[in-house]
């Protein structure tokens, strides 16, 4: 059975894509799913959480520059604390990924590169989570093309929804002829910011059928978990952050 491939994407920075990718992947693992997290962001924030030492060469960059690559050769077991996890894997990134765009600029069907690799390991995973870069370039296009669910995190800032219409239009064009799910995920919610919250919710009214019921609250445990290179569910399983990601994981399993 083919895995569900989830692209976590927004061309705006600071909306929590990597935080969501890391904790959603761990949430799916806790639900007994076989999970692969692929870091497509040269900033490598997801890689920092699950890889004590990020490789210099065995990264996702190779998937774009070596057509004959066996993808399994760059898949690593995620490390949480001191434990290597068999059913939570990661393909890490590093800053060198930023140069890949130039290297493949003349490659035919370059939007299909990632899909061609993932098709060969389809039976190994239940879920593949793609942590996308904050630009709508060829890396993000590859992620959109091969995914069956698009998750767009948005924060509760005044300008947090800028570019949403452009992103939706790009996704529709890239996925032409393919079926896919699309979800907005409200992140970094603070109850005290009532006017901003009201504004964001009003702006999302037209997308209410495509918005997750779960909202990820701004929570210090999530920040502290990142500092200690842990998913929030491990750092503090009783925290609001862990509770929110458990609810999100359930929604993803049932709807995405």
What are these regions (language model features)?
Residues 1-256:
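P-loop NTP-binding core
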